[in-house]
Amino acid sequence: MLTITSYFGFLLVVLTITSALFIGLSKIRLI
């Protein structure tokens, strides 16, 4: 259970960082 929870937590962090970087690049390109 702990391994699955930590895995999903890590996956959530990666998705959040990727989304933040993608949005940042999009804003830079729009400006």
From Swiss-Prot:
<keyword id="KW-0150">Chloroplast</keyword>
<keyword id="KW-0472">Membrane</keyword>
<comment type="similarity">
    <text>Belongs to the PetL family.</text>
</comment>
<keyword id="KW-0813">Transport</keyword>
<protein>
    <recommendedName>
        <fullName>Cytochrome b6-f complex subunit 6</fullName>
    </recommendedName>
</protein>
<dbReference type="Pfam" id="PF05115">
    <property type="entry name" value="PetL"/>
</dbReference>
<dbReference type="InterPro" id="IPR007802">
    <property type="entry name" value="Cyt_b6/f_cplx_su6"/>
</dbReference>
<keyword id="KW-0249">Electron transport</keyword>
<keyword id="KW-1133">Transmembrane helix</keyword>
<comment type="function">
    <text>Component of the cytochrome b6-f complex, which mediates electron transfer between photosystem II (PSII) and photosystem I (PSI), cyclic electron flow around PSI, and state transitions. PetL is important for photoautotrophic growth as well as for electron transfer efficiency and stability of the cytochrome b6-f complex.</text>
</comment>
<comment type="subunit">
    <text>The 4 large subunits of the cytochrome b6-f complex are cytochrome b6, subunit IV (17 kDa polypeptide, PetD), cytochrome f and the Rieske protein, while the 4 small subunits are PetG, PetL, PetM and PetN. The complex functions as a dimer.</text>
</comment>
<keyword id="KW-0793">Thylakoid</keyword>
<keyword id="KW-0602">Photosynthesis</keyword>
<keyword id="KW-0812">Transmembrane</keyword>
<keyword id="KW-0934">Plastid</keyword>
<dbReference type="GO" id="GO:0009512">
    <property type="term" value="C:cytochrome b6f complex"/>
</dbReference>
<dbReference type="GO" id="GO:0015979">
    <property type="term" value="P:photosynthesis"/>
</dbReference>
<feature type="transmembrane region" description="Helical">
    <location>
        <begin position="4"/>
        <end position="24"/>
    </location>
</feature>
<dbReference type="GO" id="GO:0009535">
    <property type="term" value="C:chloroplast thylakoid membrane"/>
</dbReference>
<dbReference type="GO" id="GO:0045158">
    <property type="term" value="F:electron transporter, transferring electrons within cytochrome b6/f complex of photosystem II activity"/>
</dbReference>
